[in-house]
Amino acid sequence: MSSHARPRSLRALGVLAALSLTVVGLTGCVSRGSDTTSTEAPELVSNDQLATVTLDVGDQKGGTEALLRASGELDSAPYDVAFSTFTSGPPQVEAATAGQIDFAVTGNTPPVFGVAANARIKVVSAYTNDASGDQILVPPDSTLGSFADLRGKKIAVGKGSSAHGHVLLQLQKAGLTTDDVQLVFLQPADALTAFTSGEVDAWAIWDPFTAIAQVQNGSKTLTTAERVANGYGFGVASQQALDDPAKNTALQDFVVRLAKASAWADAHPAEWAAAYSTAVGIDPAAGELAQGRSQRPAIALDDSVIESEQALFDVFVESGSIPGGNTFEDFVDTRYNDAIAAATASTN
């Protein structure tokens, strides 16, 4: 069954960033339950019982949808998929908690904030790259030469995003604290305006925004998250969807298709970069730059991944950004690990 989601075309970085406005209604007051422990997965149902199922999937910058379409992995899905576009991961977690989406791929930090807030979500899949696309940018004429030079300066960053985690880790590495810089919490649309107008000194951001700013505006890299952050991304599912037999079955199939699509992109980098650039309406040079360093193949959601995320959670707690008390492991569900492993093995 083909997805009924419509492709989206974006014309500029500002328009791309402004997509956060489409989900403002999802990020307000959300009722959270106390269900923070893994529950037994319901029995899988047959494919013919998926004919009336629609998976609501949160997307960022068209990445998930574009990847699945370019690879052809959506073509034979026995259920429908409706994509909603978000600019960053935190509102995706909010929407999943509210039951307004069933699944989304986020960076490494939004699930950390979800754990702190007792969000009704589970982390069900993991992805990785070297984090080189997560960068702290400065204007072309900036005289700043290192992260330490940001002492007393203003840094635009999305609260609860992977960029937020990157900044805290850079502060820790430099022996600084959040008191030594001015964090200006802005989503990409407003951060772009603040950055280009000189209202902030630096912008902590991720691809493709990083690549677009570099290609179109000549922005300079002050530092990257490579060898600083863990570079993980995560598939986050709503507890409601996981508890529903039909949606649980569709979700297992979906994460398998996504893993196969990621493997396809790795094997066809030029084709994928061109398809991605067209799908989200960005400069092909920026698309090639972003996808050359920010692809995320699926990996096992194992103890090492969970421990790394717990360490990131602890950094946020120590900074006073989130309350402690919860553990990341309690918000992880590995029910799809075997299916994803089998899928990725078959593509190698």
Regions found by a protein language model. Name each.
Residues F316-N348:
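Conserved C-terminal helix/tail region of periplasmic/extracytoplasmic solute-binding proteins
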Residues V24-G28:
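C-terminal motif of bacterial Sec signal peptides marking the signal peptidase cleavage site
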Residues D35-T177, V184-F185, A229:
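Short, glycine-/small- and polar/acidic-enriched structural segments
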